[in-house]
A protein has these predicted regions:
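Anionic group-transfer/hydrolysis microenvironments
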Residues: 7, 45, 116, 151, ...
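Active-site nucleotide/adenylate-binding loops and adjacent lid/helix of ATP-dependent enzymes
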Residues: 70-159, 163-182, 186-212
Length: 242
């Protein structure tokens, strides 16, 4: 395999046949990379969208730049999933403190304010409880474009790992149950401690999402189990850490 990375000490270099060290905006290096490979994929979702779109013009890219764009923005992601008739937390776009005040009034407390892009493992977010001011929460996330999500009281957190091929064939793995400490995934247990019917519903939801995106590759879909309901938290356009 051939690796492209901006870091000179990427661990993948140790097992790759070749590698290029260059920035994601170095389009000459990207074009040279694209000419040397048959298919390009990415292993995390913070590759710039214009980088993915550029590669797509010069080689086969999977997953597509459109799928990446949807997964990179929490508003786009939630809107897309809700449009499929799949449950997500109540949400609202927040572009300023006044927006946040209005969103809190509509969605209520507790709720969670998250940056629209780049946050992970609890970073780039602020929990809003009764004593939290909108100004404090807005400052905590760096006053970046954001999403306010209603807080979900859940019984379990699960994920579904699904793969889809060029021909549209979908394979879905057994559902793991995930446990986090300080927002970091610590354990994934397979099978999850859920009913067979709930597991089948989760797998069906994952198949719906990956098919609707016309996705090619492996995807992780994180979900909350709350009573009899399954609520999608987010999608990861890559091999998921669970």
């Amino acid at each position: 395999c051939h690796i492209f990375a901006p870091e000179g000490d990427s661990p993948a270099f140790q097992v790759s046949a070749a590698h290029i060290v260059a920035g994601y905006q170095d389009f000459a290096a990207l074009e040279a990379f694209a000419k040397r490979v048959d298919v390009v994929t990415y292993e995390f979702e913070n590759v710039p969208g214009d980088t993915a779109a550029f590669l797509e013009k010069h080689c086969v890219l999977a997953p597509s730049s459109a799928a990446l764009k949807t997964a990179q923005d929490r508003i786009d992601e939630k809107t897309f999933i809700a449009g499929l008739g799949i449950l997500v937390a109540p949400f609202a776009a927040v572009n300023g403190e006044a927006d946040l005040e209005e969103a809190i009034a509509r969605i209520g407390r507790p709720s969670v304010l998250k940056t629209r892009r780049f946050g992970y493992d609890g970073k780039g977010q602020a929990k809003i409880v009764e004593e939290t001011s909108a100004a404090a929460a807005w400052a905590e996330i760096g006053k970046a474009p954001a999403i306010l999500e209603g807080f979900i009281s859940f019984d379990k957190e699960i994920s579904v790992i699904a793969a889809r091929g060029w021909d549209g064939t979908i394979a879905v793995y057994d559902v793991p149950e995930n446990h986090h400490e300080n927002h970091i995934l610590r354990t994934s247990t397979v099978p999850a401690g859920i009913s067979r019917a709930t597991a089948e519903e989760a797998r069906d939801m994952a198949s719906t999402i990956i098919g609707a995106l016309d996705y090619v590759g492996v995807m992780g879909i994180e979900m909350f189990v709350s009573g009899t309901r399954l609520i999608v938290n987010e999608i990861a356009p890559r091999v998921h850490n669970s």
